[in-house]
Regions:
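N-terminal targeting signals for export/organelle localization
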Residues: 2-6, 10-74
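C-terminal cap of thioredoxin/glutaredoxin-like
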Residues: 5-7, 24, 28-35, 39-45, ...
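Soluble non-cytosolic domains of exported or imported proteins
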Residues: 32-36, 47, 63, 103-106, ...
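Beta-strand elements within well-structured catalytic alpha/beta cores of enzymes
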Residues: 38, 93-94
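Short amphipathic alpha-helical/adjacent loop interface patches that line ligand
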Residues: 50, 109, 202
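Residue-level signal for pocket-adjacent positions within structured domains
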Residues: 71, 79-80, 218
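A short beta-strand-turn-helix
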Residues: 75-92, 116-117
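Structural alpha/beta surface segment adjacent to cysteine/selenocysteine redox centers
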Residues: 95, 100-101, 106-176, 180-181, ...
Length: 244
């Protein structure tokens, strides 16, 4: 078998899930003359129909992308301890990669709150993704710690509606407004569990190729940047239809 034909057959085999195109009669059952004839036939066909190779490579790329997305979503859905708002048993989950210093995150805050108010079958999980500065890290730690006390929704509203730069003082003010035990909150902020949850979010973002905020994931749709409520509604409707 020529190197050209062998390379093409390997591509086709990988692209179609390991079902080898070459599972013709066993090699031992084919004589040299027949083998040469088959090689020439394959090579002539492939050269005359190069789109076959292209389609095979596209199929392979899609399979690899689908597998990568499945693995990334598995990491994303591991959300124990992540802050959330809404019905804990909702069938639709919106994951938001967010940073409290992100202006675009504040822009998407209002439509998300409106969506939660109008649809009680939606849950918003905040994937705390502090990427802008040290204060972002402190705010993310406080958000996860606020979730542990059951006061995250009010903390989140206070943080998103506050004016001015995020500082430790503004974080503690938001936590106090939400009714948090501040001593416990500060202790939890530095805990290994909170660090693990934030690191888990970083891993999910890397797998999903999310490098900025906000980043939304609804079903299998990854949406970079801020989007309006109408687009969110459309994606949710499509996700519900897909889920049956």
């Amino acid at each position: 078998m020529t190197r050209f034909v062998k390379s093409v057959l390997i591509c086709l085999t990988l692209a179609f899930g390991g079902q080898s195109v070459a599972t013709l009669p066993a090699a031992a059952d084919i004589g040299d003359a027949d083998r040469d004839a088959l090689n020439k036939m394959f090579e002539a066909y492939i050269r005359a129909n190069p789109e076959v190779v292209r389609e095979a490579l596209l199929a392979l790329a899609k399979r690899e992308a689908d597998a990568a997305l499945t693995a990334a979503l598995r990491t994303l859905h591991d959300d124990s301890g992540d802050p959330f708002i809404g019905n804990p048993d909702a069938s639709i989950v919106i994951y938001e990669f967010s940073d409290y210093n992100c202006g675009y995150c504040k822009r998407v805050f209002t439509p998300l709150q409106q969506l939660l108010a109008e649809d009680d079958d939606v849950k918003l999980v905040l994937k705390e993704f502090p990427i802008l500065n040290q204060a972002s890290i402190l705010a993310a730690q406080a958000a996860v710690a606020a979730q542990a006390q059951g006061v995250f929704p009010d903390f989140h509203v206070a943080m998103m509606t506050a004016r001015g730069a995020v500082t430790m003082d503004s974080i503690m003010a938001a936590a106090g407004e939400a009714g948090a035990d501040l001593d416990r909150l500060q202790a939890d902020m530095n805990s290994a569990k909170v660090a693990m949850i934030i690191e888990r979010t970083r891993a999910a973002a890397q797998q999903l190729k999310i490098s900025g905020t906000p980043g939304l994931v609804i079903g299998t749709q990854v949406i970079p940047g801020a989007v309006g409520i109408d687009e969110m509604r459309q994606i949710i409707a499509a996700t519900r239809a897909e889920n049956g």
